[in-house]
């Protein structure tokens, strides 16, 4: 339970935006266009998301984020 609370506090608003895009199956280029950021910045956010959620890939990150209530 404490881990869940900690994760909620450490995932940024922008990382949640990226997670929502990942949930919809968008590529890094599509996410960059949608959010008005560079593909490199998207990759940076994804790396942070994977680290924070202790996920091995994008799909697992989305599943974990949904389980933790970070995204719907």
Language model: regions and residue ranges:
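Small/flexible residues
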Residues: 11, 42-43, 60, 70
């Amino acid at each position: 339970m404490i881990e869940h609370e900690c994760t909620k506090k450490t995932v940024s608003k922008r990382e949640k935006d990226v997670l929502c895009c990942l949930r919809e199956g968008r590529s890094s280029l599509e996410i960059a266009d949608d959010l008005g950021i560079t593909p490199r910045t998207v990759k940076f956010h994804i790396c942070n998301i994977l680290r924070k959620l202790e996920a091995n890939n994008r799909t697992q990150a989305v599943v974990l984020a949904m389980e933790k209530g970070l995204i719907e």
